[in-house]
Amino acid sequence: MTRIRPDYDAIVIGAGFSGVRSLWELRRLGLTARCFDAGSDVGGTWWWNRYPGCRTDGEAWVYALKFLPELLEEWDFTERYPPQEEIQWYLSRVLDRYDLRKDIEFNTEVKSAHYSDHDSIWKITTASGKVATARYFLPATGITSIPKEPPFPGLQSFKGEVYQTSTWPAHEIEFENKRIGVIGTGSTGIQVITKLAPVAEQLIVFQRTPNYVIPAQNYPLDEKKREDIKKTFDATWDIAKRNLAGHAVKHSGRMVASAGGPEEIQRVFEDGWARGCYDFQLGTFDDSFMDPHANAVTSDFIRQKIRSIVRDGDTAEVLCPTYPFGARRPPCADGYYETFNRSNVKLVDIREDEIEVYDQGIKTASGAEYELDMIILALGFDTGTGAMNKIDIRGSQNRSLRESWTRRLETFAGVLVHGYPNMFVVCGPHLPAGNQPVSLEAFASWIGKTIEHMETNGLASIDVSNEAMDAWTTHVEQVWGGSFLAKHAHEQGSWFVGTNIPGKPSRIMFYFGGMVNLEPWLIKELETGWSSMSFTRLDGAEASNGVSKQTVGGVHVTPEMLESVQIPLEADKVGMTPAEKSKLVNAATAVYIDMAVEEMRSRGLAPKADYRVHWWKVMQDFVDSGEGQRVLQETSLTNQELERVIAKLGIEGEVIARMGPEIVNILTGKTHALAHIMRDDLLFRVYLSDEGRRANRYMAEYARLLTSQRRDIRILEIGAGTGGTTSEVLNLCSPNGESFCAEYMYTDLSPGFFNAAKTTLKKWESHLAFQVLNIEDDPAGQGFKEHTYDLIIAANVIHATARLTNTLSNVHKLLKPGGVFGLVELTRLTPFYNLTFGSLSGWWAGVDEGRTESPLQSPQQWNSLLKQTGFSGVDLAAYDLPGPERHSCLLLSTALSNSVTTNGH
């Protein structure tokens, strides 16, 4: 049977925290991935839950992604507990920062995921009937993404507005002067109630089960607090990882049983209450959730708080839970109990008085009627297994996950399920109860290492043993079963065990031992070579399954691997994406070019009769073009505004500020461009700037991959000049000056660069050799032996030669057969590069070859030229930026043995 090739290496379901983190991990590995999400934008549950007052009760400093340090540096939350819109903005920023949005299909609901034993491939089918296939399946569907269905008779008959918090509409809703009924007093209901009470004409709260609501004690984050967060971030996360609930709260070491009397207990509780939320829950007494007596003392303190806050005694008693603190997840909110002191707020106890909806509102079984304009359903979620059970997931031998989990909820460490090969669950059932982002980092990292192991070793599938899954599941059940809260959670309809959903079997959905006790299970697998896992190997036939194994020079490398390399950029410091900065750089440059053209024309000036004639024509053509006019019309700036923009643009801003005002003088020969761009090493720094750095870093990353496999390779760099690319390569391949290759030959047309380079690169002096090379002439006549080098690097130099085919043929002579040519080149003329390099004579070396507009070539043109001169063509192209802003790339090509030996003819 012919095996199919999958569409992607991996498919991710869900674009919330877990999905975004998973996409980045897959991109890091160089794998192709597709993410499907039913929402219209990123966020997962944070996209759907847009109800008034929605915010996290996890503190900002631990409710974030942590896979790279710039995520912290580039973003500041504004409050201790970020609101929904900030969480969504944050995730959207991450998508755009790492160009992940292109891999996501929004408004796409997944209906089924079926595994093929024959092909080791998952087939994903969407609600619209679209089918996509992949080797790896990563459900990152979340634990609170499936709303609980409203069970109320007569809901369709209601003539007013009905909204469910978990599917809140995007449009604005008016609440003022309306009679509003809210059904539900879990975390969501409490936030809605607190937010709407001040604006509603009347707010009727229908409560079945009261909750222990702890004040959040939210506050805005000032600049000092934000600085402190960044300084102590790693230490704070270490605390959160050790905390059983994943929050940055140290265990107090105190026990109620050994406290120094009622006054001391009261003092500790009051202090925790004043600090709020998890400082009260987790930072007062360590036995509050462990010991029945300690729990009773804690519960009674909260009940006394309720009675002291709520003025109406009957209302206060209805708000007081009678079950133990922690049997249901305690919500956190500011001002909740105070809300019931308002004259427009009424609490209705429906614990033993069922409700139904009629055309005018809600009525109880006892006969009370409440006329309403709006009903808000805050009913909670089918947590834990709900989202995955909604998808028809079938593993090996067509085994239904939904049916398997109905019998017993089983996983291995919350990540793998026996019988479902290559399915990596990301923060689903058996996730440690508590703060998800802290657990997510450990899960995503382990999944990435496991997939990387499979890719490196040619493994087709992974499946955890039934014994390992049973051992973990039994551990989860024993940890929960050993708590006195287990029985109460079942009785109180807690979503911890799923009994909030009618008919759903009582199963512990989460792990109550914390990530500190889960992660060792994962680490053990890494340390023992995945001893609890079985793998199948890719043979020759199975290789057609579509494993992404692109190799250049014997190294596994893909554009995705290189383009996902994280590079600290100046744009990061001012909160811009690289694409945003590039757009501003070119817009600011265009303003100066426009002013120069206007001055030249109005004064009747002519350029000096040399290469500047070509430069002048290109500038005029740009200003007169539709594209130029569009850029200029979109860049309407006063001189002061232009200066402010340029000041934010780092090295590129220096170039614009220095060269822009001198364009007319350079054109007319009154001054020379080199006098400006060489001052203060500006030209050298241009190659290290955001505009020039990404493709250079790709070159360095490929060199690192190559030299990590072979230390005997010989490297030659053409036109190394100021050493910008060299520095990137050496810092990555040999950060401490250690040996990494047999030879690194540093060449340039002029020896004048060598002394400065020897000083700059002194750490690597024992590895470097320096020799003059004019690549336009035969290398053999300059003392170079043919077919000597394994890797030749040329960064933004080949285009500045007179005859490209002649130059490339000379490069080919220096490479061994099978050697790799790494060509970093600009691929599109931008206003900035026209200003920076168009002002230099070397830019126009190719005029006689017909390159009069620009010396630059597109990747397609380079592909053709390389094939003409003894190379394989472009084996790989990795670009600097997405879409229309891209203008630079790394091209890798292999030297063929049947070489062209005559200067391209």
Curated annotation (Swiss-Prot):
Upper lineage is: Eukaryota, Fungi, Dikarya, Ascomycota, Pezizomycotina
List the residues marked with site Transition state stabilizer.
R329
Q: Which CDD domains match?
A: AdoMet_MTases (cd02440)
The family line of this record is: In the N-terminal section; belongs to the FAD-binding monooxygenase family. In the C-terminal section; belongs to the class I-like SAM-binding methyltransferase superfamily.
Q: Domain comment, in the record's words?
A: PsoF is a unique bifunctional enzyme catalyzing two different types of reactions at completely separate steps of the pseurotin biosynthetic pathway and comprised an unusual combination of two domains, one homologous to a methyltransferase (MT) and another to an FAD-containing monooxygenase (FMO).
**This protein's name:** Dual-functional monooxygenase/methyltransferase psoF
Instruction: Spell out the Gene3D superfamilies in the cross-references.
Output: FAD/NAD(P)-binding domain, Vaccinia Virus protein VP39
Keyword Acyltransferase, does the record have it?
no
Q: Where are the transmembrane segments?
A: none
